[in-house]
């Protein structure tokens, strides 16, 4: 059976760390910041590590060959 292709959209959204965790940008920062709290805006800055079960799903379904 041939190798599964990596999803191009996932390549742009996720990065796998050296320890195997998955990093992604925080959601909810495209528009509508005026009604968000300053804490939300501050916490959503940069990237975050996905929870272990979510990271495993991303790698298995979208990034089978890593990056």
Curated annotation (Swiss-Prot):
InterPro entries: Ribosomal_bL35 (IPR001706), Ribosomal_bL35-like (IPR021137), Ribosomal_bL35_CS (IPR018265), Ribosomal_bL35_sf (IPR037229). One of its GO terms (biological process) is translation. One of its GO terms (molecular function) is structural constituent of ribosome. PROSITE patterns: RIBOSOMAL_L35. Keywords: Ribonucleoprotein, Ribosomal protein. GO terms for cellular component: ribonucleoprotein complex; ribosome. Belongs to the bacterial ribosomal protein bL35 family. HAMAP family: Ribosomal_bL35. This is Large ribosomal subunit protein bL35. The lineage of its organism: Bacteria, Pseudomonadati, Pseudomonadota, Alphaproteobacteria, Hyphomicrobiales. The gene is rpmI.
């Amino acid at each position: 059976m041939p190798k599964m292709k990596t999803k191009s959209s996932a390549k742009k959204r996720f990065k796998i760390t050296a320890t195997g965790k998955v990093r992604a940008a925080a959601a909810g920062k495209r528009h509508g910041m005026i009604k968000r709290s300053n804490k939300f805006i501050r916490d959503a800055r940069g990237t975050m590590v996905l929870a272990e079960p979510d990271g495993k799903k991303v790698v298995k379904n979208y990034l089978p060959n890593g990056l």
